[in-house]
């Protein structure tokens, strides 16, 4: 009797651990998806500010490189 109770408790503990682990994997994949979508939106906003290859962006210290605004390049160089 004691052995069967112990096995039931161990089984419940194993199921709990497995469910908790699968929930964290699902949350990580959701977080990865959201980060990818937000990063894509930031990239699209940067492209929208560009007027063309090496054109000036709305900010005076930004310029376009391959249609992406960047703060680390000088236009025309």
Swiss-Prot record:
GO molecular function term, any single one: toxin activity
Can you list the disulfide-bonded cysteine pairs? 50-64, 57-69, 63-75
According to its UniProt record, where is this protein located?
A: Secreted
Which residue ranges make up the pro-region? 22-49
Q: Which UniProt keywords apply?
A: Amidation, Disulfide bond, Ion channel impairing toxin, Knottin, Secreted, Signal, Toxin
Carrying Lysine amide, the residues are: 77
Specify the superkingdom: Eukaryota
Signal peptide range equals 1-21
Tissue-specificity statement: Expressed by the venom gland.
Q: Which GO terms describe its cellular component?
A: extracellular region
Question: What's in the domain note?
Answer: The presence of a 'disulfide through disulfide knot' structurally defines this protein as a knottin.
Its annotated function is as follows: Probable ion channel inhibitor.
Family to which the UniProt record says this protein belongs: Belongs to the neurotoxin 10 (Hwtx-1) family. 65 (Jztx-21) subfamily.
* Protein name per UniProt: U14-theraphotoxin-Cg1a 1
Q: Which organism is it from?
A: Chilobrachys guangxiensis (Chinese earth tiger tarantula)
């Amino acid at each position: 009797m004691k052995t069967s109770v112990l096995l039931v408790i161990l089984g419940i503990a194993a199921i709990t651990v497995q469910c908790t682990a699968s929930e964290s994997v699902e949350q990580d994949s959701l977080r990865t998806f959201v980060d990818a979508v937000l990063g894509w939106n930031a990239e699209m906003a940067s492209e929208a500010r560009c007027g063309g290859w090496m054109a000036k962006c709305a900010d005076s210290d930004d310029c376009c490189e391959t249609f992406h605004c960047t703060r680390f390049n000088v236009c025309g160089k």
